[in-house]
Structure formats: structure tokens, C-alpha cells
Amino acid sequence: KWRINGMKKVGIFMADGCEEIEGLTVVDIVRRAKLEMTTISITDKKEVTSSHNVTFLTDTLASEVDFEGFDAIVLPGGMPGTLNLGASDIVNKIIKKFAAEGKIVAAICAAPSVLGAAGLLEGRHATCHPGFEEKLTGAITSEDAVVVDGNIITSRGMGTAIDFGLAIVECLTEFDEEVVGHVKKGIVYRNFEEA
């Protein structure tokens, strides 16, 4: 029905040990908003096994992606998925590049710690899974479900994944009420009729 100025492209890095709900909820919400979403494995295989032993296939491998056309990159949490993301050269390269270019960098649960380690949270407001606050180097921490500070979006965990996905859509569509309302109605989001 609607057309967003220039199709927005979102990538989500998937690592073995990721929290599947945090990752796949964002994929679902972004696709419901009719934005282009690509699931990206950080290993040499498309198959990813989550922290709760759910195995799924990604769209592509990080080594095969041209990230130039992307508008946002997302990091789901989970353990040891977050550690795997943090240890990935390509993840660190892309999040730093996107942050410097003003593109959206979004992380949930433990994954904001990867942003902290990369120096991307200095002086920024951010949130994370309880117990990871010390790893948000330089951040002004919050207990809010989702925190948007410029082009950095952070969230607390599986229970906030829908709000996290909606925040990503809101930022990418410049808070287009028609798009966001369509998604909220489609997922029977709380108070969607008021939105």
C-alpha cells in the first residue's frame, strides 16, 4: 500500500548461540513493514544454531554481502552468540563503519556490550540485559525497554524484542504512522488501536 522513499535495507548478523526470539522477531517486524531484511551468518555456513538449540538458515554469509546499500545493521543477543559477534572482525568493522556514517546500529540483550567494546557508546544513552551494564563502556545506562540515541538503538532482551523491532521500523520510516500502525495492528500489538 505505502511506498517509503527508497527501499530501506536492514541486515541482521546471526551467530551460533544467538537468542533466536530476539533475532527472528526483528526479522518478522521489519518484513511486515515491507522493508528489505537480510539475515546474515557470520560463519562460513548459512545454518545457525541458537542458544536454545533452534537451527535455522540465514539468507547469506557475511563474507558475501556488499554492505554499502544497507541502512541499518542489527545484533541479537544471547550467549554465546554475543561473544561470537564480538569476536568477529567483519561485525566490528561494519558496526564501526555504519556508526561513523550515521546509519542505524541496533543491538539487544547482551549485544550492546559489543557496541561498548567497539567504542560506539561513549556519551550515548543505552540499555542492555541486566548485568551487562558495566560492558557498555562510556554509556549513560538506562533500564528503559528500548533506548534510541541518534543512530544507536539498544534494548534489554527477549521480552522487549517487539518494541525493539518497532523502534527500528520507526527510525527507518521516519515514524510513518501508516507503516508502524499497519505492523502494530497485524501483530495485535497492545493498544494498537490507540497508535
Mark where each language-model region is.
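N-terminal beta-loop-helix "entrance" segment that forms/cooperates
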Residues: 40-59
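Histidine-anchored nucleotide/phosphate-binding helix
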Residues: 27
